[in-house]
Amino acid sequence: MDELNINFDKYKNIRRTMGRELIDLNPIQRGGELPVESKKAIYEYWDGYSVCDYCGGRLDKVETPPICEYLHDVSKFLGMDFTRPTHGARESKFIVMHSVCNEGDFVVLDGNAHYTSFVALERAKLNSEIVEHDGYPTFRVNPEKYAEVIDNLEDKNKPIGLILLTHVDGNYGNLADAEKVGKIAKQKGYPFLLNCAYSVGRLPVNGKKLNADFLAISGHKSMASASPCGLVSIKGEYADKVFRTSKTHPVKEIEMLGCTSRGAPLISLMASFSHVAERVKNWDNEVKKTRFVVDELEKIGFNQLGIKPKQHDLIKFETPILDEIAQKDKRRGYFFYEELKKRGIGGIKRGTTKEIKMSVYGLSWEQVRYVVDNIKEIVEQGNNI
């Protein structure tokens, strides 16, 4: 065999400094940091099919490690009936759409929906109808608009298969009124899917109390899990559709393609369960930290977008003051990223100064104040250029 001209050494020592050497402000990562117990558990199960040592043919039935018990317990935690592991919220959404809807049906969803909601419904050969938000600067989704969009589709005799709401969106961190949208869906007679990628695992969520029929959950985004991992949690009345089994291989659930996320990601999700169940009790304190950041940074020229006051940790700021400094600094738009990095802070997108997204979820008050003080210092120094 001819010798390959490949430098294999560069793949042997891959390492990452974010999170270990830098305070990570990236909202997509704040809820996914693993506690020590999860890192230890991964060590035991990082080999390929190690969770399948005692598998009887289906992942959700495995007793050692206690996957079966975990799925039962996490269903109670979520206020739902049945749960399965997935590779993430996007896969959870597709599973629901593909099993509950008919080809050509319409999915009614909010204007803040994540791109994966649209990709999932397109993959399932469905159509979308958007409930528009109220625009700048709040981008709020009005639950009553769902009723209007549904009525309009019904007047046109368009088939509706599913109502979808983004519980917390990834752009502005708006916490939507899921209970009201779920009530409208129930009154209209349509199943309701709640995308909880940024909520379950960060704040308390009870699916049935929110009138949800399905929850799409991200483990790596909000449940302190390695990636890729998520959950789909459902009401019992939909179990026969969502968890239907194969004609040729009766033990296998079709929508799961037999088995979904397994190995290290699933083990980390399970090992983090007690940590996650405990931290959601501190949600009020997380909101206080977030509002503190907003209050302090708006004093120096930042402007928080989205609903005020903040009800979620994800913050999006307009930052004209940073853009003004960038015009004077020889590093241009990279100055803010570089100044933060010097101070042991990361997670802000490189080269961005007009708008930034950040989160201090899970940080101590000391760390939060450190972040705020250093951003103030950077702006003060920039104003003196």
UniProtKB/Swiss-Prot annotation:
Q: Which residues bind pyridoxal 5'-phosphate?
A: 89-90, 195, 218-220
Catalytic activity as recorded in UniProt = O-phospho-L-seryl-tRNA(Cys) + hydrogen sulfide + H(+) = L-cysteinyl-tRNA(Cys) + phosphate
Q: Which GO terms describe its biological process?
A: translation
Q: What Pfam family is a match for this entry?
A: SepSecS
**Keywords, alphabetical:** Protein biosynthesis, Pyridoxal phosphate, Transferase
A GO molecular function term, named singly, is: Sep-tRNA:Cys-tRNA synthase activity
EC assignment: 2.5.1.73
Q: Report the residues modified as N6-(pyridoxal phosphate)lysine.
A: 221
Cofactor names from the entry are:
pyridoxal 5'-phosphate
Q: Which HAMAP family match?
A: Sep_Cys_tRNA_synth (MF_01675)
Record note on quaternary structure: Homodimer. Interacts with SepRS.
Instruction: Give the family from UniProt.
Output: Belongs to the SepCysS family.
Q: What does this protein do?
A: Converts O-phospho-L-seryl-tRNA(Cys) (Sep-tRNA(Cys)) to L-cysteinyl-tRNA(Cys) (Cys-tRNA(Cys)).
Know the name of this protein?
A: O-phospho-L-seryl-tRNA:Cys-tRNA synthase
